[in-house]
C-alpha cells in the first residue's frame, strides 16, 4: 500500500479531513483568546468557557473535544509499527520560557518536527498541565506534557505525554530552574539548550484520535497522539509545578462517535 493511500485510510478512520484542510483558525484564535478572561475555576472555569465569548462556542457545543478518557476496551488496534507511523526529529533549542499565567510554555526554534503518516508538522512549543488532562481507563496522571506542532498548510498535531511521580527528571529541572515566577513574563537564555526528545518515552506505542485544543477557543480537527507509556518526574518536581498551577487541566469530554486508534 502506498504511503499516501495508507494515510488517507487512517485519517478517514479518525474522521479527519484527508488532505488540504487548513486548521489555521486553531493557531490564530488562541491569540484572540488572550483578550478574554478565562481560567480553570469559578465563573471563568471550563464549564463556562462557551459562555465567555462567541469565539469559544465550540468549548460548549463541539462534538470532537479534548481531553478524553482513553478506554482501552474500545480502542481499535492498528498493527503497524508505531515508529513508522509517528517519526520525531527534535533538535536542541535555546531555552525560551513563558509563564503566561495558565502554564509554563517553552517556545521552540524552527527546525524540529514530527511526521505522522508521512505528513510533516513543525514543533512550535510545549507546555504542561497538572493534573493530566487525558485519562486511561479512568486513571489520572500527575501531569501531562503537550508538544504542539503545525504543518505548512496550518494543520495542528499535538503529542501528549503523561508524567508520573518517580525518578528525578534532569531536563524538566532545567526548565523549572529558569521559569519566571511572575505571570505574563518570559525569559530567553541563549546559552542553555533544551531538547524535547529527552521527554519521549522509550516505548513509542500511542493512541491517536481527532480532537480539539484543550483551552479556548477549543478549535476542533486537531490530530492527537497520546503516548501510552508515561515518563517520570520526582515528587518534588511535580510539587513545584502544582504550587504554581494547582489546577490547569480541563475535565474529560465525551467521546461521542469518534474512533480512537492505538498504534502498536
From Swiss-Prot:
Keyword annotations for this protein, in alphabetical order, are: Lyase, Metal-binding, Signal, Zinc
Q: Name one Pfam family in it.
A: Carb_anhydrase
Chain segments annotated as coiled-coil in the UniProt record:
none
Q: Does the keyword Cytoplasm apply?
A: no
Q: Where does Zn(2+) bind?
A: 127, 129, 146
Q: What is its EC number?
A: 4.2.1.1
Q: Explain the post-translational modification.
A: Predicted to be exported by the Tat system. The position of the signal peptide cleavage has not been experimentally proven.
Query: What's its catalytic activity?
Result: hydrogencarbonate + H(+) = CO2 + H2O
- UniProt binding sites for substrate: 214-215
**Gene Ontology MF: a single term:** zinc ion binding
> By its UniProt entry, which PROSITE patterns does this protein fall under?
ALPHA_CA_1, ALPHA_CA_2, TAT
* Span of domain Alpha-carbonic anhydrase: 36-264
- Give the family per the record: Belongs to the alpha-carbonic anhydrase family.
Can you say what this protein is called? Carbonic anhydrase
Q: Name the gene behind this protein.
A: ecaA
Amino acid at each position: 500500500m502506498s504511503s499516501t493511500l495508507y494515510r488517507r485510510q487512517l485519517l478517514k478512520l479518525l474522521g479527519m479531513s484527508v488532505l488540504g484542510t487548513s486548521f489555521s483558525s486553531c493557531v490564530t484564535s488562541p491569540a484572540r483568546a488572550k483578550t478574554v478572561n478565562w481560567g480553570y475555576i469559578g465563573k471563568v472555569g471550563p464549564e463556562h468557557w462557551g459562555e465567555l465569548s462567541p469565539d469559544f462556542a465550540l468549548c460548549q457545543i463541539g462534538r470532537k473535544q479534548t481531553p478524553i478518557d482513553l478506554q482501552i476496551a474500545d480502542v481499535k488496534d492498528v498493527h503497524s509499527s508505531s515508529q513508522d507511523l509517528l517519526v520525531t526529529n527534535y533538535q536542541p533549542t535555546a531555552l525560551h520560557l513563558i509563564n503566561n499565567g495558565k502554564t509554563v510554555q517553552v517556545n521552540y526554534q524552527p527546525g524540529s518536527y514530527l511526521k505522522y503518516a508521512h505528513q510533516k508538522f513543525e514543533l512550535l512549543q510545549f507546555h504542561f498541565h497538572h493534573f493530566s488532562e487525558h485519562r486511561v481507563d479512568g486513571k489520572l496522571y500527575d501531569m501531562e506534557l503537550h508538544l504542539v506542532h503545525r504543518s505548512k498548510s496550518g494543520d495542528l498535531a499535538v503529542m501528549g505525554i503523561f508524567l508520573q511521580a518517580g525518578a528525578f527528571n534532569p531536563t524538566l529541572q532545567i526548565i523549572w530552574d529558569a521559569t519566571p515566577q511572575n505571570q505574563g513574563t518570559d525569559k530567553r537564555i541563549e546559552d542553555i539548550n533544551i531538547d524535547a526528545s529527552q521527554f519521549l518515552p522509550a516505548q513509542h506505542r500511542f493512541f491517536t484520535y481527532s480532537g480539539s485544543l484543550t483551552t479556548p477557543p477549543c478549535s476542533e480537527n486537531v490530530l492527537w497522539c497520546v503516548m501510552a507509556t508515561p515518563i517520570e518526574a520526582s515528587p518534588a518536581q511535580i510539587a513545584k509545578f502544582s504550587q504554581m498551577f494547582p489546577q490547569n487541566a480541563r475535565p474529560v469530554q465525551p467521546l461521542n462517535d469518534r474512533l480512537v486508534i492505538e498504534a502498536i
